[in-house]
Amino acid sequence: MNQVIKSFKNKHILVVGDSILDKTVLTRAIGISLESPTLKTREIEENISFGGASNVAKNVLALGAECTFLTLLGKDEYFKNYVELGKELNMMSTMSNRKNTVKSRYWVEKEDVRYKYLQINRGTSAPISENEFSELFSKFKKVLFSVDTVVFVDYDTGVFSNKNNISLMIKAANNAGKATIVNSQISDGENRYPRFAGATLFCMNKVEALSNYPLFTATDAGMKGLCNLLSTDVCVTLGDEGCIASISGTTIKIPANFVEPIDPTGAGDSFLAALSVSLPEQDFR
């Protein structure tokens, strides 16, 4: 295990995908409005951090690997946050006339207990234009031969809106001999994993596995059925039960390490980052 972790510093991961900013506003409950049944709070603090594909890139760096992050951005009032936060990510962005995606979560604290009261999602999922993709793909090909693994992170905000574009990127990576990992969120939309045919490995959660293969179970038979349907290797995260992976027909189930959860936001991104720096060794333990 220690040797695998030490090897991370020699890895260069290319993360391609949809950028998200996570805006967290922590408040304290102070009462109920007299005019309407509205909860009144006082702001304690506010912070903005990377989410989506940008959070995967951030976690790759935290593991000691080198990372290049390729994404599509809009030059709006949140662009400066990407510039500031993205300095360490070696971010290569293609500019677009779009609103950047921001997920604002409002937390209320009362008597040392915190709960999420409201989430507001902002941004657009407009398809990437032909000119935008041409610029993005040019940057993709330029950096491709210097990386070990390519990770496609799809949050359905535009980067992967065109199936033919996806095929071009996967084909280029395969021709360059690079492993490709795909994570495609389906919590707010359709199942888009079939668009990524030809990738090395799909990484998904149990809900996404069931969306692809309704007969899925976290067993050898369930994994083989899922892999046969998708024609690729698959790793499925199982929450507090760990994960199960099928690599070249061999199924491995790994229990989770016990931790005291504080906020599960971004847990999947962290797992994906760890998987990406481990994939060449195929040593998930």
PLM regions with names:
Residues 18-19, 155, 186, 270:
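Active-site metal-binding loops of divalent metal-dependent hydrolases
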Residues 9, 61, 87, 174-175, ...:
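Anion (oxyanion) recognition and catalysis
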Residues 127, 146, 161-181, 185-198, ...:
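Conserved phosphate-binding/catalytic region of the ribokinase-like
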Residues 1-14, 136-143, 188-194:
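Short amphipathic alpha-helices and their capping/turn segments at secondary-structure boundaries
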Residues 13, 21-152:
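Conserved N-terminal subdomain of the carbohydrate kinase-like
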Residues 89, 193-212:
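Structural recognition of alpha->loop->beta junctions
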Residues 15, 69-71, 182, 236:
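Structural beta-sheet core signal
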